[in-house]
Amino acid sequence: MTQQVDRYAVFGNPIGQSKSPFIHTLFARQTSQQLTYSALQPEHGEFITAAKAFFSEGGRGCNVTAPFKEDAYQFANRLTERAELAGAVNTLKKLDDGEIIGDNTDGEGLVQDLLQHQVTLKGARVLLLGAGGAARGVIQPLLDQKPQQLVVANRTSSKAELLAEMFSSHGNIKGIGLSDVNEGFDVIINSTSSGLSGQLPEVSDVIFNSNSTVYDMVYGSGTTVFNQWALDNGVHAAYDGLGMLVGQAAESFMLWRGLRPGTKQILRELRKNLEM
């Protein structure tokens, strides 16, 4: 009798560029887990139908990327606290009782990557650029690290202020407009997607100093536009979001399989793969 192989997947649209199947296949090999992991692309507005079909046909869990994270939030029967706070779900798991739990591992992926790079978050002044879903998903894990202050800056200041209000009981956080940022920070995190179109967020280079560590959530084969700008302004170090991608994947894998895979080797493989 052949052993039943557990099925996992990632949902997104577009999904052709996703590195998740590559990452999870390597995780499975590393931890000797029998599973398959595929990329699925439902039409816009079709996520819930596709997810229902996936789970009813024996799917055990899935990752969810743009534009379906809010849909996944609605789809889950239960939510972890961090998913509830993030208002979005990037990981779904079918429990033994048939219930589907939604989690958000993005913030944990970011924090783990920063800590792996030996970035000090405790007592640091942290600037988070952008106030969209990507920003909201990482605020609570960042505040859990006890920074001196987390400043969320966004083109529309009211969105940043709203996020600050939402998370005010979790730590020292304030929201302002991008044009109001007029001082340097220890850690600067870019959650805006402006770099994907070669643009920079409309913020002054006064944010950078020689002790600043910069983190851009986007990644590519070379240095990101934002990180290049930061390096040109003399920052201490600049990292892209590839480590966050691998970190959030490791956290999802842990939720599904109860095992935490190592990330360093896989990050090296992925980087090599990107640069080919």
Curated annotation (Swiss-Prot):
Reaction it catalyzes: shikimate + NADP(+) = 3-dehydroshikimate + NADPH + H(+)
Recorded metabolic or biological pathway in which this protein acts: Metabolic intermediate biosynthesis; chorismate biosynthesis; chorismate from D-erythrose 4-phosphate and phosphoenolpyruvate: step 4/7
Amino acids binding NADP(+): E81, G130, A131, G132, G133, A134, N154, R155, T156, S157, S158, K159, M217, G241
Pfam entry (one): Shikimate_dh_N
EC assignment: 1.1.1.25
One GO BP annotation of this record: amino acid biosynthetic process
InterPro entries, per database record: Aminoacid_DH-like_N_sf, NAD(P)-bd_dom_sf, SDH_C, Shikimate_DH, Shikimate_DH-bd_N, Shikimate_DH_fam, Shikm_DH/Glu-tRNA_Rdtase
Gene Ontology, cellular component aspect: cytosol
Active-site residue numbers: K69
Presence of keyword Transmembrane helix: no
Signal peptide coordinates: none
Keywords: Amino-acid biosynthesis, Aromatic amino acid biosynthesis, NADP, Oxidoreductase
Class of this enzyme: oxidoreductase
The keyword NADP belongs to this UniProt entry's keyword annotation: yes
Sites where the protein binds shikimate: S18, K19, S20, T65, N90, D106, Y219
A molecular function GO annotation: NADP binding
Task performed by this protein: Involved in the biosynthesis of the chorismate, which leads to the biosynthesis of aromatic amino acids. Catalyzes the reversible NADPH linked reduction of 3-dehydroshikimate (DHSA) to yield shikimate (SA).
UniProt similarity note: Belongs to the shikimate dehydrogenase family.
Subunit comment: Homodimer.
Family matches, as PANTHER family: BIFUNCTIONAL 3-DEHYDROQUINATE DEHYDRATASE_SHIKIMATE DEHYDROGENASE, CHLOROPLASTIC, SHIKIMATE DEHYDROGENASE
Name used for this protein in its record: Shikimate dehydrogenase (NADP(+))
